């Protein structure tokens, strides 16, 4: 009798284990193997960081409705995942972006899009364009829909409304898109009626645009976790591969199942109503080696009114600190390195030195301290970047761009590589765990 009851119990446990497993996708970076060295590649990528940082630190222009821009004045994210869109599924490489809500894809026909490999709505039986009467339309900034008639009390009949259309800037260009829905496939998971922007034309240079589209992983109603409902239980994580590992991939895990690491240390996730897509955390201090960095009081304080605080972002390349924080960090780092020939600047980096002149172990590690007792000790690869041709290394962080809105610190993807970062929106927390992602 015991055996007959044990077998069904084991089957139930097995089914629960399978159901709890997280979906997993490979994550690739955009650094090409022919690049001269990781240092030169990162310098080139970091040139576009300033525009993204200004976007992250600026407040929403209007109050009221919570909107999700199809795109922004940001630089393209550095990492991509393979996803399927449509029925039958069409494979696309979508840029991974934790600071954007909306997903969008370049759609055919589009003679000005940056890639010839476009999503073809005509080949998908589940594709549908969405009219201005769609409840999703007001959530997108920049929609071109007719205003309500009859003194603002009555709207045109749904059948007479055009497709909800957009024209939005992105980097140095802008694109025109229509609101649509289709089946999004991530690994073995299928999410029907997924709302996204279908890009039909691009104006301006396309060099800095994602080649095929973007996957929005922010916190707003248009983002993946919101549209997926209970499928992923409000949790995803990623482990980003090193810029040095051209031929290796990291992973994006969706869901709170067994695929997420057990040794995660969590810090509370803060929310800014003006930038509700962003993942804010409360940094309490920095240390270089065993020395705490002396920063002015309140330098890390979260302020929803101004946007000040610290954001964890997948699309910014190098970590930026506001002027007083970075000045103090740089001073302590230089004091400990004590490079005999001093320091030079290279691209965005102002603390580069000759490694031949510094004793072994002379470059100290940087640790980011957060609420909840989280001490994110950055590996040396995440602290310094090296030239492959010369004995030159640079502190892989920089000062935030000087602008009235540049009040936000950003923990960027270079400092996150080979670390599992868990975004647990359901429990309002962000977690970190060491992991070899390559």
From Swiss-Prot:
Any one GO molecular-function label of the UniProt entry: aspartic-type endopeptidase activity
Role played: Anther-specific aspartic protease involved in tapetal programmed cell death (PCD). Directly regulated by the transcription factor EAT1/DTD in anthers during tapetum PCD and degeneration.
GO biological process: proteolysis; regulation of programmed cell death; systemic acquired resistance
Family: Belongs to the peptidase A1 family.
Induction record: Down-regulated by chilling.
Keyword tRNA-binding: no
Cross-referenced Pfam families: TAXi_C (PF14541), TAXi_N (PF14543)
Lineage start: Eukaryota, Viridiplantae, Streptophyta, Embryophyta, Tracheophyta
Gene assigned in the entry: AP25
Active site residues per record: 97, 313
Disulfide bonds listed in the record: 107-113, 352-394
The organism of origin for this protein: Oryza sativa subsp. japonica
Enzyme class: hydrolase
InterPro entries found in the cross-reference section: Aspartic_peptidase_A1, PEPTIDASE_A1, Peptidase_aspartic_dom_sf, TAXi_C, TAXi_N
The protein's name: Aspartyl protease 25
EC number from the UniProt entry: 3.4.23.-
Residues carrying covalently attached carbohydrate according to the record: 123, 193, 282
């Amino acid at each position: 009798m015991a055996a007959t009851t044990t077998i069904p119990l084991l089957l139930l446990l097995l089914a629960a284990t399978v159901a709890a497993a997280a979906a997993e996708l490979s994550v690739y970076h955009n650094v090409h193997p022919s690049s001269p060295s990781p240092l030169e590649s990162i310098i080139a990528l970091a040139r576009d960081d300033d525009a993204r940082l200004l976007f992250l630190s600026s407040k929403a222009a209007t109050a009221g409705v919570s909107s999700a821009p199809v795109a922004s004045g940001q630089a393209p994210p550095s990492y991509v995942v393979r996803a399927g869109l449509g029925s039958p599924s069409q494979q696309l490489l979508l840029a991974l972006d934790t600071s954007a809500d909306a997903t969008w894809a370049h759609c055919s026909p589009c003679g000005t899009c940056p890639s010839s490999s476009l999503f073809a709505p005509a080949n998908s039986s589940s594709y549908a364009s969405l009219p201005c009467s769609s409840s999703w339309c007001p959530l997108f900034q920049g929609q071109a829909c007719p205003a309500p008639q009859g003194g603002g009390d009555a709207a045109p009949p749904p059948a007479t409304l055009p497709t909800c259309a957009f024209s939005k800037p992105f980097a140095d260009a802008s694109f025109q898109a229509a609101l649509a829905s289709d089946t999004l496939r991530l690994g073995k998971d299928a999410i029907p009626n997924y709302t996204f922007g279908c890009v039909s034309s691009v104006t301006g240079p396309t060099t800095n645009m994602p080649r095929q589209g973007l996957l929005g992983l922010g916190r707003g109603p248009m983002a993946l976790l919101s549209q997926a409902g209970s499928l992923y239980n409000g949790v995803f994580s990623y482990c980003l591969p090193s810029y040095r590992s051209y031929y290796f991939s990291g992973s994006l895990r969706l869901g709170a199942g067994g695929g997420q690491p057990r040794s995660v240390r969590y810090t509370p996730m803060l929310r800014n109503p003006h930038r509700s897509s962003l993942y804010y955390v409360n940094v309490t201090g920095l240390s270089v080696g065993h020395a705490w960095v002396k920063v002015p009081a309140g330098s890390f304080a979260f302020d929803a009114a101004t946007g000040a605080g610290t954001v964890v972002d997948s699309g910014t390349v190098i970590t930026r600190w506001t002027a007083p924080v970075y000045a103090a960090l740089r001073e302590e780092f230089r004091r400990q390195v004590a490079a005999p020939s001093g320091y030079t600047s290279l691209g965005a980096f102002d603390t580069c030195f000759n490694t031949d002149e510094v004793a072994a172990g002379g470059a100290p590690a940087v640790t980011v301290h957060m609420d909840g007792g989280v001490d994110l000790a950055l590996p040396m690869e995440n602290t310094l970047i090296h030239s492959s041709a010369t004995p030159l290394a640079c502190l892989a962080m920089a000062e935030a761009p000087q602008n009235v809105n540049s009040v936000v610190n950003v923990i960027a993807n270079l400092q996150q590589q080979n670390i599992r970062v868990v975004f647990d929106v359901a429990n309002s927390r962000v977690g970190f765990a060491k992991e070899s992602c390559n």
